C-alpha cells in the first residue's frame, strides 16, 4: 500500500484484546499511512475515537497499560442481589463511563479527524445504527462509544434519543460492511476476536467466561456469513495473534498493544499481498492444500454442510474426499475446518507442502 492510497480503517471489537488497535494505529502512522476515516465497533470505536479526537499514541498506551479490572469491570452486586434476573447487566456502567470520559471527553463527531463511524444496534428493533454517518452525527461521541461497548448482559443498554442501543458486534463485530456505503476506497480491517480453532478450558471460566466464549463464536460465525460473497471494495485483513487472550483478561495488556504493532508492520512489509486498484474480495490471498485424514473421518457430512458447495464428497465408505485440494484462501476462508468434530480436515500452505516434498 502506497502512502497516498486512501483507505478506511475498520477496528473490530474483542474486549481487552482490542487494545491491539493502539499498536495498529501506531504502526500505520509511523509509516505515513493515515486513514481517511475510521469505523469502529466496541473497543475499536473507543480507541479510534480517542485517537481521532486528538489523543496521542503515547497517552493512549499509557492509559491502556495502566488499566486494572476495577477501571472497567465492576460487578453490580446490589442489582444482582436485589433485582436478580431483572438486573440490567453484570457490570456497573460507571467505570466504563469514566474510562470513556478520560479518552473521548465531550467531543462531537464534527471534531474528529479523521471522521469516525461508531457501530451500534438498536436493542428493540435489531437495526444496525452507525453513528457519525450523515444525519446520525448530532450526538456526543461518548454516548455512541458507550452504546458500542455495551455488550448485552455485561453492560446495560445505553439510551440515545429515547431508544436503547447495545454493542454493534451483535450484528457485525468487524463492520467493514458499513464502509461500503462510504465509497469504493480500500478497506483495512483489523480483527482481534478469537480466531483459534481450539480455545482451551473456556468451561472453567465461570458463567461470564462461558458466555463470553459463546459470544465470540457467534460473532465469528456471523462475520463469516456476511463476507462469504464479499466483492467490493477490496479488503485487506489484519489479524493480530491475540486469540489466546480472553475478552476480560488484564494479564497481557502490553503484549496486546505490541502485537497490534507487530502484525500491522508485518502486513505493510508484504507489499505484494496488498490488493491493486480493481482487485476484489478479501486479501491477502494464499494458496493452500486441503486434505482429509481418512482414519479420523467418521462420515458425519458436516464438511458437506459447512464447506464450499462441491468441495467435499463422501465415497463408498462414507469417508470425506476433497474434490478441489488446491485452494486460494483469504483470512476469512476455511472456517468450515472447525466444524469437523474429529478434526480430520487439514489445511497447509501450498508452498510449505512443496518445500516438504523437495526436502523429502
Task: Give each language-model segment a name.
Residues 320-334:
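Short linker/helix segments within small regulatory modules
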Residues 1-38:
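Helix-rich "cap/lid" substructures immediately adjacent to catalytic or cofactor-binding pockets
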Residues 295-296, 339:
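Short pre-active-site segment immediately N-terminal to redox-active cysteine/selenocysteine motifs
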Residues 35-53:
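Catalytic nucleophile loop
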Residues 302-318, 335-352:
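Iron-sulfur cluster-binding cysteine motifs and their immediate structural context
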Residues 2-7, 57-103, 121-141, 160-165, ...:
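Non-catalytic peripheral regions of patatin-like phospholipases
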Residues 104-117:
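A short alpha-helix-loop-beta-strand transition element characteristic
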Residues 14, 24, 44, 118, ...:
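Conserved small-residue
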Amino acid at each position: 500500500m502506497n502512502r497516498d492510497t486512501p483507505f478506511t480503517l475498520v477496528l473490530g471489537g474483542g474486549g481487552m484484546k482490542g487494545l491491539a488497535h493502539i499498536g495498529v494505529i501506531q504502526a500505520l502512522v509511523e509509516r505515513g499511512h493515515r486513514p481517511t476515516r475510521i469505523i469502529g465497533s466496541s473497543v475499536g470505536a473507543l480507541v479510534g475515537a480517542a485517537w481521532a479526537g486528538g489523543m496521542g499514541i503515547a497517552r493512549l498506551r499509557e492509559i491502556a497499560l495502566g488499566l486494572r479490572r476495577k477501571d472497567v469491570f465492576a460487578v453490580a452486586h446490589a442489582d444482582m442481589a436485589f433485582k436478580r434476573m431483572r438486573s440490567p447487566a453484570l457490570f456497573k456502567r460507571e467505570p466504563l463511563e469514566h474510562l470513556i470520559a478520560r479518552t473521548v471527553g465531550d467531543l462531537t463527531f464534527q471534531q474528529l479527524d479523521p471522521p469516525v463511524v461508531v457501530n451500534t444496534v438498536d436493542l428493540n428493533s435489531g437495526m444496525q445504527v452507525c453513528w457519525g454517518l450523515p444525519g446520525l452525527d448530532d450526538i456526543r461521541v461518548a454516548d455512541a462509544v458507550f452504546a458500542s461497548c455495551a455488550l448485552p448482559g455485561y453492560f446495560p443498554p445505553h439510551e440515545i434519543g429515547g431508544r436503547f442501543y447495545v454493542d454493534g458486534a451483535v450484528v457485525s463485530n468487524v463492520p467493514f460492511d458499513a464502509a461500503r456505503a462510504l465509497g469504493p476506497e480500500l478497506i483495512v480491517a483489523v480483527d482481534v476476536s478469537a480466531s483459534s480453532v481450539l480455545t482451551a478450558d473456556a468451561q472453567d471460566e465461570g458463567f461470564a467466561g462461558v458466555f463470553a466464549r459463546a459470544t465470540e463464536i457467534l460473532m465469528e460465525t456471523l462475520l463469516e456469513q456476511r463476507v462469504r460473497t464479499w466483492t467490493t471494495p477490496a479488503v485487506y485483513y489484519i489479524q493480530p495473534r491475540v486469540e489466546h487472550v480472553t475478552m476480560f483478561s488484564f494479564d497481557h495488556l502490553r503484549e496486546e498493544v505490541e502485537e497490534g504493532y507487530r502484525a500491522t508492520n508485518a502486513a505493510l512489509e508484504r507489499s505484494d499481498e496488498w490488493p491493486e486498484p480493481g482487485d476484489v474480495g478479501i486479501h491477502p490471498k494464499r494458496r493452500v492444500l486441503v486434505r482429509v485424514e481418512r482414519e479420523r473421518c467418521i462420515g458425519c457430512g458436516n464438511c458437506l454442510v459447512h464447506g464450499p458447495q462441491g468441495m467435499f464428497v463422501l465415497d463408498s465408505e462414507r469417508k470425506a474426499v476433497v474434490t478441489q485440494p488446491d485452494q486460494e484462501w483469504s483470512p476469512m476462508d476455511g472456517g468450515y475446518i472447525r466444524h469437523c468434530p474429529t478434526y480430520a480436515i487439514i489445511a497447509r500452505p501450498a508452498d510449505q507442502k512443496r518445500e516438504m516434498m523437495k526436502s523429502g
